Amino acid sequence: MVARFIFLSFIMLVGTLAPAKAQNSFPYPALPDSLRSVEQRAAYLSEHYWDNFNFSDTLELANKEMAEQGFVNFIDILARFDQEIAQKGIAAFTAKAYQQKPSKEKFESLIEHYYENPESPMRNDRVYALFLEDMAKSPYFDETEKERIGFKLKQARKNLPGTQATNISFMLEDGKPHQLSDYREKKVILYFYDPDCENCHKISAWLDKQTIPAGISLLRIVADNRLSTIYGLKAMPTIYLLDKENKVILKDCTPEQLMEALRGNENRK
């Protein structure tokens, strides 16, 4: 897996880089001196990130340190922005990336790998949906491709943060039927798992050792085919955090992200 940059260090580092590119490094844009804050620099970078990358150069496309590492850093940045800024960055990227077949195939493959691979730490359906929306509108994809993209977009949009979680019926360890809508007035952790998944049991044991604040319901739900389809589950386990109205706070998060969010909530009290 290609390495992720630490966000703040990355933004400050880019500000010191010249646009000239080394043989094996991504050609980051020079940031205007007038941009003083991290937020301003980051917003500019998202929109101008690909200005110096030559999408028609097959050597650059094949260079993992340039094309793939550059893409990983790009999507890491996008995940930290609101919808409007992320959309602008993606629009600037897609306006160039899909014009020629080698570039289109390269980046379509990277998008699929980093957003659909269950092992990818970069999975983020909010940002993935923005890429898919742009691909669905692009003149560089034919109708057959757009039909496939449309299906993926429908899956990615399921239960995004800020939306109402789909109500489901399920069985818990008590053997009784439950409805998600029954769990109101408390935050809810949905822990979808496969009983035969070794990693599920490891993460479940890890969670048992953590301090989950009082007033939060942890629901361990066996992910059968029906639930996997409804929630578009890609990996086991899959963890959601819902608010007291069953609105999604975190979707498909790591155990560490879950505990960080719970600790942050406790600190705000």
PLM feature segments, named:
Residues 176-205:
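Short active-site neighborhood of thiol/selenol oxidoreductases, capturing the structured segment around
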Residues 172, 242-243:
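Short, acidic, Ser/Thr-enriched surface-loop or helix-capping motifs
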Residues 214-226:
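Thiol-based oxidoreductase modules, predominantly thioredoxin-like and allied folds used
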Residues 199-212, 255:
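Typically the conserved alpha-helix immediately C-terminal to a functionally engaged Cys/Sec
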Residues 1-25:
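Bacterial Sec-dependent N-terminal signal peptides
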Residues 23-167, 172:
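Oxidative protein folding and maturation machinery
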